[in-house]
């Protein structure tokens, strides 16, 4: 904070509030937040959050909120300044004992402090009896859980994040005692890294296709492939999406047929979302929006309905 070099989002993930680990979780958060507040005179980094793993019942969230209130009272932190994210890692976090969605009650228990919900691929698949060989971000069980999160938390302002790829792009062979690797070892390292990169690229692309624009990375070498997947996702469709949106807007949002694709008013927001997400991540430049026939001010309304109303007034 002193050197103004922090990332735009930052936080701490504590241990889960299980019987075995709750005391450690509370102690860790107390020490961390108290020390941070003391060093910064009660100022938190921008977008600071506490991530709560393995949340299964609203009482877990309520307990954290109560702890937040105690910490804010005993330090110089402003009231309600501590925010949290939920990790959705078990079937109990998706559906409660009555078969209802558990997610709204978990968020409600946060008393307005919940900013995000993160899907935990490997704990969730293990909880649904998927064997280790078939645990993956693209497993149908994971798609179901992520879709439930979207349906339950859509429109609430809670950001959704996908899980991680657990295959590391790290070769199995390393030089020892000054001996260089053989050609076959170098080739095997290359193959392992490229396979891991390919898997990570495909996983990120899968998340994007399902409407998840944020995800976890476990290794620095995952980052280049996330950038590649995100930029590829948006740039490959930029030309066609621009034509569709421009044609649609040019006909005052009447239904249009571009090639073999039929667009009506229901498509408008989806097309707008494409540009909003692309601009947000940096893949699409604001000047690219001009090709759609929309102005930047119209794009910034984030609402296709408002754009239409503005043009009709």
Q: Where are the regions that the model predicts?
A:
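Expand to "…catalyze enediolate/carbanion chemistry for C-C bond making/breaking, isomerization
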Residues: 1-313
């Amino acid at each position: 904070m002193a050197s103004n070099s922090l990332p735009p989002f930052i936080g701490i993930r504590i241990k889960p509030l299980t019987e075995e680990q709750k005391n450690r979780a509370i102690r860790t958060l107390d020490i961390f937040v108290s020390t941070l507040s003391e060093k910064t005179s009660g100022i938190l980094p921008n977008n600071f959050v506490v991530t709560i793993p393995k949340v299964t019942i609203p009482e877990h969230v309520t307990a954290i909120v109560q702890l937040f209130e105690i910490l804010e009272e005993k330090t110089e932190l402003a009231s309600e300044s501590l925010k949290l994210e939920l990790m959705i890692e078990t079937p109990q976090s998706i559906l409660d004992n009555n078969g209802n969605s558990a997610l709204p009650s978990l968020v409600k228990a946060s008393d307005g402090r919940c900013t995000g919900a993160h899907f935990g691929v490997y704990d969730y698949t293990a909880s649904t009896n998927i064997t280790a060989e078939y645990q993956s971000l693209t497993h149908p069980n994971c798609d179901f859980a992520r879709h439930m999160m979207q349906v339950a938390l859509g429109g609430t302002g809670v950001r959704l994040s996908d899980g991680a790829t657990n295959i590391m792009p790290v070769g199995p062979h390393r030089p020892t005692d000054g001996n260089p690797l053989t050609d076959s070892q170098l080739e095997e390292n290359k193959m392992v890294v490229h396979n891991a990169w390919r898997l990570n690229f495909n996983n990120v692309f899968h998340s994007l296709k399902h409407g998840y624009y944020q995800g976890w990375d476990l290794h620095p070498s995952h980052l280049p492939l996330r950038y590649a997947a995100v930029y590829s996702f948006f740039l490959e469709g930029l030309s066609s999406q621009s034509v569709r949106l421009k044609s649609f807007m040019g006909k005052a949002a009447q239904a249009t047929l571009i090639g073999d694709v039929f667009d009506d008013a229901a498509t408008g927001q989806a097309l707008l979302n494409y540009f909003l997400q692309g601009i947000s991540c940096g893949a699409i430049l604001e000047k690219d929006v001009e090709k759609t026939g929309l102005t930047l001010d119209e794009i910034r309304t984030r609402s296709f309905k408002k754009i239409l109303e503005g043009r009709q007034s």
